[in-house]
UniProtKB/Swiss-Prot annotation:
EC number of this enzyme: 2.5.1.75
Source species: Burkholderia ambifaria (strain ATCC BAA-244 / DSM 16087 / CCUG 44356 / LMG 19182 / AMMD) (Burkholderia cepacia (strain AMMD))
Keywords in alphabetical order: ATP-binding, Magnesium, Nucleotide-binding, Transferase, tRNA processing
Annotated family: Belongs to the IPP transferase family.
Protein name in UniProt: tRNA dimethylallyltransferase
Site, Interaction with substrate tRNA: residue positions: T108, R130
Gene name of the encoded protein: miaA
Amino acid sequence: MSASPQSRPTTITCLLGPTASGKTAAALALAARRPIEIVSVDSALVYRDMDIGTAKPTRDERARVPHHLIDIIDPADAYSAAEFRADALRLIGEIAARGRTPLLAGGTMLYYKALTQGLNDLPTADPAVRAELDADAARDGWPALHARLAQVDPATAARLAPNDSQRIQRALEVFLLSGQPMSVLLAAPRRADDEAAAYRFVPVALEPSDRAVLHARIAQRFDAMLDAGFIDEVERLRRREDLHLGLPSMRCVGYRQAWEFLDGDTDYRTMRDKGIFATRQLCKRQITWLRAMPERIVVDCVAPDATALALDTLERVLDDRLPT
């Protein structure tokens, strides 16, 4: 599905949206009518043995249409935006070579940005540096590391909460490895390549006209996860000696809150409330990312006929029937 620099770029349809916005339903509706394969754009779905809390597509759903970039790594390992970009570009070509149509679907906007806009020259993760920062945080607390970050990269520190451990750790890691603030490196021109330039990525964005409706869905879905055995899932992960709350997998929304409950740090109701709140905050960040994409095609994800609207929009993109 690649194209020469002189030819017209191949359109790649992308179904993006916040958590609980109906992406799976829309993708499956399209799969019933088109020979598609779904490439997941979701940083949580890459992990094996994390099914309930990530709302992973069911076995039946995955049997109905091929899914990619799901269950590809162990929770003890990390998966970067650079790895996603390479995998997604490879899969797009492979799916097209089979005579089928790739559909990118998910809500990890950092992955989508890396795919469509290229990568910054940020250093890769270093386990030794991360272990040292984790030890410092265990001794002094993440607010102290946030204060340290403010001294070397005030721009990044200003946009992070003092307990945002994952992002504070990454920003300090980048500074320690490169000697430059992450904010400076992110402001530098991104690296592009001919392979991505062969494609025209068209984002179809599922966004709520009434955020309260989406919030209600989030609460219902979190309760359904709890009823489906989410706590037992986290307990099985927690028994593994190689997993801990410092890992990206265990920082996924819901998992941290359930882990803290199992540690005895919170009661059940507090765990539930914190899990729902964290999911709502994730939803807010996802919508903010989407609204920064002027090229997106918006579908109201809380409309009564949202799935039909999304299906119609996706088919218009695939058939090149969009207004110019």
